[in-house]
UniProtKB/Swiss-Prot annotation:
UniProt lineage: Eukaryota, Metazoa, Chordata, Craniata, Vertebrata
Residue numbers bearing the Phosphoserine modification: S248
Source organism per UniProt: Sus scrofa
One MF annotation (Gene Ontology) recorded for this entry: mRNA 3'-UTR binding
Domain of life of the native organism: Eukaryota
Modification N-acetylalanine, positions: A2
Known catalytic reactions: 2 a quinone + NADPH + H(+) = 2 a 1,4-benzosemiquinone + NADP(+)
Quaternary data: Homotetramer.
Protein name listed in UniProt: Quinone oxidoreductase
Keyword Glycosyltransferase: no
Gene: CRYZ
Example GO biological process: xenobiotic catabolic process
Record-listed NADP(+) binding positions: 53, 158-161, 181, 200, 229, 246-249, 269-271
Transmembrane segments: none
């Protein structure tokens, strides 16, 4: 560490494992932006399920140890690299990825993963945009290629990605069905664009969905927990229906004939494999949503930086999501 280099507090992970492997350190060097990089003073950072998969070592992405978790930050630009022209010190911004990790007082990001945060949205809302909204937009507009008038079912609709999917689907003229596991979660789903909501903890909730949509079935299913729901999803689809897998925590056995008889398809999405061109298209759609007003993140539990391990426990084991989980700095 260079003499006189400024320090910050940050969560550090020295080995893959449970939430307890995350340690708060106060002697981490503040990164210095190079070329096309932006240094952001972090005001809030989103906590995503993918953060827990990466931390546990079960995700395809395995950062070099030690590392700082966190991809979605919102804050103020502190400094920029010499080749950055789109941002300047003092700008309010949010990110869809970071280079140095977002569970920290400062975060470094490539300038093409940084976006201006409108004044109408606060920093907590800004930290809830990145992965949830870009993922939902990718799933609905690029992978499912939804059309106005289609029926979409969003599993886990009360979480960050789920709420984003509800808002986007409603804005694009779809009939929106959602599932959630608590009364509070169901109310949030209805408040954010769903026409109907179903309690996935009820034994007969699949039958209720079938009754609601009738013989036609569902055109698109946005699936957050494929290892639990995928087999049922295939039976709910219309002819030519699509299941878009956003999340899964393990394997599941399905009958391929369920796809053959309806000409249906299963497609997985992973935001980190998207091209720069796709990110630009997603960003344009979401910026329009901010301007018009349908993009309005819902904030769930809020934790201080030192409670990051508790946040990771809660995002996996909570009874039901109620908005986006945030670390507030």
């Amino acid at each position: 560490m260079a003499t006189g280099q400024k320090l910050m507090s940050a969560i550090r992970v020295f080995k893959f494992g449970g939430p307890e492997v995350m340690k708060l350190q106060s002697d981490v060097a503040i990164p210095i932006p190079k070329d096309n990089q932006v240094l952001i003073k972090v005001h809030a950072c989103g906590v995503n399920p993918v953060d827990t998969y990466i931390r546990s070592g079960t995700h395809n992405m395995k950062p070099l140890l030690p590392y700082t978790p966190g991809l979605d930050v919102a804050g103020i630009v502190e400094a920029v690299g010499e080749h950055v022209s789109s941002f300047k010190k003092g700008d309010r911004v949010f990110t869809v990825s970071t280079l140095s990790g977002g569970y920290a007082e400062y975060a470094l990001a490539a300038d093409d993963t940084v976006y201006m945060l409108p004044e109408k949205l606060d920093f907590k809302q800004g930290a809830a945009i990145g992965i949830p909204y870009f993922t939902a937009c990718l799933a609905l507009l690029h992978s499912a290629c939804v059309k106005a008038g289609e029926i979409v079912l969003i599993h886990g609709a009360s979480g960050g990605v789920g709420i984003a999917a509800c808002q986007i689907a409603r804005a694009y003229g779809l009939k929106v069905l959602g599932t959630a596991g608590t009364e509070e979660g169901q109310n949030i789903v209805l408040q954010n664009g769903a026409h109907e909501v179903f309690n996935h903890r009820e034994v007969n909730y699949i039958d209720k969905i079938k009754k609601s949509v009738g013989e036609k079935g569902i055109d698109v299913i946005i699936e957050m927990l494929a290892n639990v729901n995928l087999s049922n999803d295939l039976n709910l689809l219309s002819h030519g229906g699509r299941v878009i897998i956003v999340g899964s925590r393990g394997p599941i056995e399905i009958n391929p004939r369920d796809t053959m008889t309806k000409g249906s398809s299963i497609k997985g999405v992973a935001l980190y494999s998207s091209t720069k061109e796709e990110f630009q298209q997603l960003a344009a759609a979401l910026q329009a949503g901010m301007e018009v007003g349908w993009l309005r993140p819902v904030i769930g539990p809020v934790y201080p930086l030192e409670k990051a391990a508790q946040a990771h426990e809660d995002i996996i084991h909570s009874r039901g999501a109620t908005g986006k989980m945030i670390l507030l700095l």
